[in-house]
């Protein structure tokens, strides 16, 4: 759950755009409505009844009466009336985190009154096209939005006894996705799903899942492996006030599932990103070497599923400046890193591989990483001005990456970004930072992926920077950068990773739980909601 400060942005709608489609009504004012169209499924499929939805947000205090009409493309059959009426608006409760274990959640109202319209539709054959949703009403200028239609081929209906076995895509690269373990029902330090629900396009293919469920973990392993991703870099948080004491940590359920509980754990790797910036890091070198590191060695590094490169466990230090501060300066930090290497060698490894986060382009932070004994540097994400176009975003990302590489101070692990958009947290939590919104759409994402691959292939053969790639981000549903399959983009981003970085044919069959007769996985979240109500 990282933080980034970006310029403020005005976000009209995440998915649909409002456009005048007829001459202005006598009111002659822009439509106040915000339209968010989405498919209920992350993977609509031919031969199956699917649902098209639109969430209509009404920022005014008026009780508007609307006619909402869906115009389908040829080949898509409507099973409900094309025009439906909206006259009732409501603001549902949102249960937002206080980031405080003793007083974890507070009840707030949704930002805008809203209503959702749903149509059942069907296509007999695979189909691509565009549907249009129009909204009109007395005193409201007509508004329209569109939604891509992409029905995958029909599958024979089956009920699988478990998550279907992954068919891993072959790749020569070590591809990892950064991973936030914040989606366990009722986790007091995390936002949870409630603030995300007003953004229905962000709903994952797995639904509002409970991350505590190992079956959810196995779906994530399947999705990752089948698109060339072979490890997750998982955020790891020490408990507040725990520095200097035997280790206690929070949100460790995902690491436990991947290493110990998932059925497919032997096929996948994980490593930890030490989030030492907002909760406790270490009190001093003694705490690092006698509390924290031994805990990691025994509980994580010695597990077969923990990522090692050249027999060195991989660890990310998110806030290197805090690490230096807590150890009493750069020289002390370097000495401690040397002792971490010695301890890992004594435990049977070849040392430890430490990577530190830095997303800027100035040389001084990279030089500090060198002086502290870091093995490499990477960017968690990229800070992009919200007013740049998607094409400019490609150039800005690559300019940032190339400047850090050309500095030549230490290996730079490339990061392939999705974007940024923490609007759910800004709207519904005590989010302390500013926010912007930018998105690398699939076409731009493909361009960046191809350029990063070219850059990696130009690096010394066998070097870390030629082998390792990080994706930003797997599941930051609240921060607004997420490559995992969801309603908004399906498998589009993962398929691009497979196309660019994997061997063999790009053709493959993606599955969602309903294809296998599995799920839903939201029982934990729904049960928790009842306790809040």
Per-range role (PLM):
Residues 46-62:
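Short beta-strand elements of extracellular/lumenal beta-sandwich folds
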Residues 1-4:
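Positively charged n-region of N-terminal signal peptides that target proteins for export
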Residues 52-56, 119, 131-134:
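Buried hydrophobic-core signal for structured, non-transmembrane domains
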């Amino acid at each position: 759950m990282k933080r980034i400060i970006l310029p403020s942005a005005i976000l009209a709608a995440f998915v649909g755009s409002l456009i005048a489609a007829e001459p202005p009504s006598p009111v002659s004012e822009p439509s106040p409505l915000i339209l968010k169209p989405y498919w209920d499924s992350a993977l609509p499929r031919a031969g199956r009844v699917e649902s098209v939805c639109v969430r209509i947000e009404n920022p005014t205090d008026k009780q508007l009466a609307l006619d909402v009409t869906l115009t389908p493309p040829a080949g898509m059959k409507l099973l409900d009336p094309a025009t439906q009426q909206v006259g009732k608006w409501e603001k549902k409760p949102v249960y937002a985190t206080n980031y405080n274990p003793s007083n974890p959640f507070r009840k707030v109202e949704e930002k805008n009154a809203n209503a959702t319209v749903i149509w059942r539709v069907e296509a007999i054959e695979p189909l691509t096209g565009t549907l249009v949703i129009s909204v009109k009403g007395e005193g409201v200028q007509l508004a329209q939005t569109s939604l891509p239609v992409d029905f995958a081929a029909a599958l024979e209906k089956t009920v699988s006894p478990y998550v279907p076995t992954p068919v891993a895509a072959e790749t020569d690269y070590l591809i990892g996705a950064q991973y936030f373990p914040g989606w366990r029902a009722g986790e007091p330090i995390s936002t949870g799903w409630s603030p995300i629900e007003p953004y229905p396009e962000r709903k994952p293919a797995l639904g509002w899942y409970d991350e505590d469920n190992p079956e959810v973990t196995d779906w994530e392993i399947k999705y990752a492996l089948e698109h060339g991703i072979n490890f997750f870099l998982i955020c790891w948080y020490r408990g507040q006030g725990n520095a200097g004491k035997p280790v206690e940590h929070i949100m460790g359920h995902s690491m436990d599932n991947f290493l110990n509980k998932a059925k497919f754990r032997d096929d996948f790797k994980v490593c930890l990103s030490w989030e030492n910036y907002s909760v406790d890091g270490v009190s001093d070198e003694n705490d690092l070497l006698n509390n924290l590191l031994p805990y990691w060695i025994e509980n994580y590094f010695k597990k077969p599923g923990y990522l090692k490169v050249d027999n060195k466990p991989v660890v990310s230090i998110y806030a290197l400046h805090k690490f230096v501060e807590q150890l009493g300066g750069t020289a002390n930090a370097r000495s401690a890193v040397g002792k971490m290497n010695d301890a890992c060698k004594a435990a049977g490894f070849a040392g430890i591989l430490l990577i530190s986060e830095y997303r800027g382009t100035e040389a001084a932070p990279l030089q500090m990483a060198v002086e502290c004994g870091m093995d490499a540097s990477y960017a968690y994400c990229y800070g992009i001005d919200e007013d740049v176009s998607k094409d400019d975003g490609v150039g800005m990302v690559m300019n940032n990456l190339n400047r850090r590489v050309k500095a030549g101070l230490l290996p730079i692990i490339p990061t392939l970004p999705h974007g940024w958009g923490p609007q759910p947290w800004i709207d519904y939590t005590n989010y302390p930072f500013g926010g912007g919104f930018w998105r690398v759409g699939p076409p731009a994402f493909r361009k960046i992926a191809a350029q990063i691959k070219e850059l990696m292939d130009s690096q010394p053969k066998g070097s870390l920077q030629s082998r390792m790639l990080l994706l930003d981000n797997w599941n930051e549903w609240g921060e607004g950068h997420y490559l995992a399959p969801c309603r908004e983009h399906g498998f589009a981003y993962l398929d691009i990773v497979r196309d660019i970085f994997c061997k063999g044919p790009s053709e493959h069959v993606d599955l969602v739980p309903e294809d296998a007769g599995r799920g839903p996985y939201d029982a934990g979240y729904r049960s928790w909601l009842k306790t809040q109500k």
